[in-house]
Every structure is written in structure tokens, then in C-alpha cells.
């Protein structure tokens, strides 16, 4: 391990490692300084100055715009990304054109090395937690579920609208030790599901009714004639 590396943050009371990153400081590059909860230091590995601190985040949320029915599932989805100043570098924009995904505190050290120091991508990255709320057409505000982003920053949640009308959806990322909170809003309309009419038998036409009456009458006449014929034959005997 070279002198001045890695850069480690320890708990002052317990000595436990909070985080570490493979940056190297040198005497001629100056000592790290801290102000406004941000550490600034020179990294001799790439001759850049790094600022280490809690960064801003950006949350998005989308809902279906059409075809939403009461009682049918929909998917609410979005992203949570890191929008720190460093993510706007040419290298980062080229590698992450859709934004740098936000990750959990536990994944932060290896993730930052991957983003900024050309280290291999971590194999076990965990995302951040997002909670979704809705304001329905009755002005009832309620939580509808909690989900977690993946390594691309994407999240989704299945939910079933229970009343008709307009819904406003709020996706809230509460923040972590590494990121400030952020939230996003969208809306959709749920309509009552269409009731499919039950098939009914079409009523008989007047012609059909007269036809069957005539048939019945003819049958009755034939039966009567047959009975009379039998009686006459017996009388002759």
C-alpha cells in the first residue's frame, strides 16, 4: 500500500471504517481540506482535485397516460440518479448518457471508484429506496408501496386503482448518508371498466309466431280427423 493511499474515513469514537476510496494524496499536492461538509483533496493517481461530500439526486416517475381502468393493474416507474457536478464530466457523460445511477451507502465506495477512477464495475450493487404516494379524486393521500432501484437506477411498482377519477402520484427518495432527497410527480385518470352486455335471445318475429300457430293448428286437425276415422271404422264393424 503506497503512502498516502487509500483515502479512508473512520468513526472517531469506534475506529470503524465508514468508507474508503482509492485516492492518493501527496505532500506537494497539499493536504485535504474540509468545509461546508465537503472534503477537497488532490489525487496523485490522475492529477485531479476531488470533492467528497453528500451529493444531489434526481428522481423521475411515469404513469400510463391512457387506458387505465378501475380494478386493473398499472405499472408506475421511474429512475433515481446522481446529479453531482462530477457526473457532468465528459467521460461520465459518455459512459452514462442517461445519468449516473444512485446506489446505496453500502455500495458507494466501489461504485465511486467505478464511476471516477476506471475501476471494474462492482458485481453486487444495491440501489436506493423509493416510496410512492397517491392523492386520489376524493383528496385521500396515502402510501401505495415501497420499491428499490436496480443498478441502472430504474424502479417500478405494480398498483391497482380502486376508485375512478384523477390520481396524482408522488415518488419520494428520502435520501441517504450519500445523497440529498428528491422527489417527482405525475398524474393519470382511472375510468370505470366497461360492462360487457350479456347476449340475449332475439324475440321471434310476427311471421315466425303465426307460422308455429298454423303448424300447431294443422297438427290438431290431423289428429281430430284420425280419431274420427277410427270411430267410423269401429261403428261399421
Where do the language-model regions lie?
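Secretory-pathway ectodomains
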Residues: 1-70, 74-104, 116, 123-124, ...
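Enriched for extracellular/lumenal, surface-exposed ectodomains of secreted and cell-surface proteins
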Residues: 163-182
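A generic structural motif
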Residues: 24, 148, 162, 186-188
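Secretory targeting signatures
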Residues: 51, 76-78, 171, 177, ...
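Glycine-centered loop-to-beta-strand initiation motif
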Residues: 139, 143-159, 165
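Intrinsic-disorder/low-complexity, polar/charged segments enriched in Ser/Thr/Lys/Arg/Asp/Glu/Gln
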Residues: 73-75, 154-156, 183-185
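Signal that preferentially marks extracellular ectodomain short beta-strand elements
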Residues: 113-120, 154-162
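Extracellular and select intracellular beta-sandwich modules with Ser/Thr-enriched
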Residues: 142-145, 180-185
